Swiss-Prot record:
It is found in: Cell inner membrane. NDH-1 is composed of 14 different subunits. Subunits NuoA, H, J, K, L, M, N constitute the membrane sector of the complex. The keyword NAD applies. GO terms for biological process: aerobic respiration. This is NADH-quinone oxidoreductase subunit I. It holds the Pfam family Fer4_7. Belongs to the complex I 23 kDa subunit family. Its main location: membrane. GO terms for molecular function: 4 iron, 4 sulfur cluster binding; iron ion binding; NADH:ubiquinone reductase (non-electrogenic) activity; quinone binding. Its cofactor is [4Fe-4S] cluster. Residues 198-220 have a biased composition (Basic and acidic residues).
Length: 220
């Protein structure tokens, strides 16, 4: 290992007399360092402010932000999207989703109760990813502080209003859990996508020779 050599800086001359102290003070006060600091201060003073007055003002959130869930309805009809498959309950790593269903007269599952314990939820978004009907999605409401547990996780709090769904007052959800508009372009190719099928000319060259050519080889 190479030996490191350290360069020693010259020691600062000691100031003894009052005249030397005065000169050192003037040099330090009127040096370039002072003007550099003043220039930076003036620049920041006239720069636009980035401070917002929360909660009256809020910064825009990403559409794929993961916060309190939303239960979606079908547009126009207003029916609930959830079919009671229970995939969100099974994949939940924090075990905070609880679904109680029963079989209706049409042999379809009917939802009796759907609760989410927001006190245990880690907002990972797995429930939104696994939902086949885009029934549960991640919203952007992060202000959910409360003094009572009973205010956490009621279905009426998550579910989109039926009137808004019938009037189509809200667009189709494009946040976390939904398919991106340009997902085909962003989809990564698999190794099998690079395998090219052989052309007709290559397949003819690789095909086995005819029986007559084998007979000719045997006679030779």
């Amino acid at each position: 290992m190479a030996k490191q050599e350290y360069k020693q800086l010259p020691k600062r001359a000691e100031v003894h007399s009052a005249t030397e102290q005065f000169k050192d003070t003037i040099k330090t006060s009127l040096g370039l360092d002072l003007f550099k600091g003043l220039g930076l201060t003036i620049k920041e003073f006239f720069s636009p402010s980035v401070t917002i007055h929360y909660p009256m003002e809020q910064l825009p959130l990403s559409p794929r932000y993961r916060a309190v869930h939303h239960l979606q309805r079908l547009l126009d009809s207003g029916s609930e999207r959830c079919i009671g498959c229970g995939l969100c309950e099974k994949i939940c790593t924090s075990n905070c989703i609880r679904i109680i269903t029963h079989k209706g007269e049409d042999n379809r599952k009917k939802i009796d109760s759907y609760t989410i314990n927001l006190g245990r939820c880690i907002y990972c978004g797995l429930c939104a990813e696994v939902c086949p009907e885009l029934a549960i999605v991640m919203g952007n409401r992060f202000e959910n502080a409360s003094t009572q547990r009973s205010q956490y996780g009621s279905k009426s709090e998550f579910l989109t209003s039926e009137q808004d769904a019938k009037n189509c007052s809200h667009a189709e959800f494009l946040g976390f859990g939904a398919v991106s508009p340009n997902y085909n372009e962003r989809m990564q190719a698999t190794p099998l996508d690079y395998v090219q099928e052989p052309s007709k000319e290559e397949s003819k060259e690789e095909s086995p020779t005819s029986p007559e050519s084998h007979k000719g080889d045997e006679n030779v």
